């Protein structure tokens, strides 16, 4: 469950930021960070890597603007993502705003109501 040294790190948020505090979620998967920028309550990633979510807010995609060392991140202890996809920061990190993200109402990317109910039921059984 290692991260890839030298590969960029990203953070998605509906809020404008200058830095992240310790405990913030980051990922090396830019598309996943973009999905999180829309403040979804559910995110799924298929085995083929297709990301679907129910987020509807305009958001912001950020690049972590400094080197991230092994001690700067720890695997998210309660993630539902594949190992290595979602990390928590252990210290404050500067970010660079890349762009504003707008949720695209593409049926293929949005989770349907029956899919959301199924996911909610799976979480309740954990």
Say what each PLM segment does.
Residues 1-8, 13-24, 28-126:
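Conserved NAD+-utilizing ADP-ribose enzyme module
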């Amino acid at each position: 469950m290692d991260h890839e040294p030298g590969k960029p790190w990203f953070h998605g948020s509906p809020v404008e930021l200058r830095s992240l505090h310790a405990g913030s979620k980051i990922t090396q998967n830019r598309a996943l960070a973009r999905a999180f920028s829309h403040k979804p309550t559910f995110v799924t990633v298929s085995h083929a890597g297709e990301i679907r979510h129910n987020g509807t807010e305009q958001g912001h995609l950020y690049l972590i603007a400094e080197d991230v060392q092994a001690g700067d991140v720890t695997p998210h202890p309660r993630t539902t993502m594949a190992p290595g996809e979602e990390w928590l920061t252990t210290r404050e990190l500067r970010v660079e705003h890349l762009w504003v993200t707008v949720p695209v109402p593409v049926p293929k990317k949005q989770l349907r109501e029956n899919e959301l109910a199924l996911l909610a039921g799976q979480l309740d059984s954990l």
